[in-house]
Amino acid sequence: MSQVILDLQLACEDNSGLPEESQFQTWLNAVIPQFQEESEVTIRVVDTAESHCLNLTYRGKDKPTNVLSFPFEVPPGMEMSLLGDLIICRQVVEKEAQEQGKPLEAHWAHMVVHGSLHLLGYDHIEDDEAEEMEAIETEIMLALGYEDPYIAEKE
């Protein structure tokens, strides 16, 4: 199985207590090599201000969000392994984990898995797309040793 090249950027005012680079690498490797051979992904961990600004600029949503995915569009005729960028907001991930009663590490893993699937072209706008994407996320999370991230919604 091929490995994903990770460019990890920690852009928080306080970077203590964040997952280790090896964890981010493990989470990426659980997703992307299943779908494509060589890949490069940037993960940028940010504070709420940067997440808010990017979410407003690119999605028209006036609030920070947990993860933003920016797939790289390779020009026709060029071969590049760059898959795209994930922007993950530390404070939103921490708040959601607490509100949802999930272990923080599991929620970080879920955000990487979820965002990676977006980079690979998956979406959850339509119900059938959401079901397919959530099924893949659940399978990957279970393989990583975490609980189904959607268990509360299914009960």
Curated annotation (Swiss-Prot):
GO terms for biological process: rRNA processing. One of its GO terms (molecular function) is zinc ion binding. Pfam families: YbeY (PF02130). Its cofactor is Zn(2+). The keyword Lipid metabolism does not apply. Its EC number is 3.1.-.-. HAMAP family: Endoribonucl_YbeY (MF_00009). Single strand-specific metallo-endoribonuclease involved in late-stage 70S ribosome quality control and in maturation of the 3' terminus of the 16S rRNA. This is Endoribonuclease YbeY. It comes from Escherichia coli O81 (strain ED1a). The gene is ybeY.
